[in-house]
């Protein structure tokens, strides 16, 4: 079940629904993750939104530019683009899987094909919770290993 405070966050930021519908109507998944989910649950206002998607950065850039949005690649190695609207900064990152060598804190990154793999790489706090705005107002997604 989605907390009413998270639903309120989405309702107060119609841009999130528009963005989510744009991705879904073009065959892509898009999930709100990270601090925005936390802030929505805790009823804290935010204008910083992170999403994860199965669209590659190139697919996201093409989709967004076709619909007159301005984008910047901010983390090529991490599959992240930044999107601006009039009041929000949005980061959209392709699903990914991180692996670590025993002697390094820097991850080796590869694209993942599903949400659960992406969530499983995140720390096991609120950052591993995802919310699909376009698909369901009824539940949050957690990695199965939590």
Residue ranges and their predicted role:
Residues 1-140, 146:
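Catalytic cores of the polymerase beta-like nucleotidyltransferase superfamily
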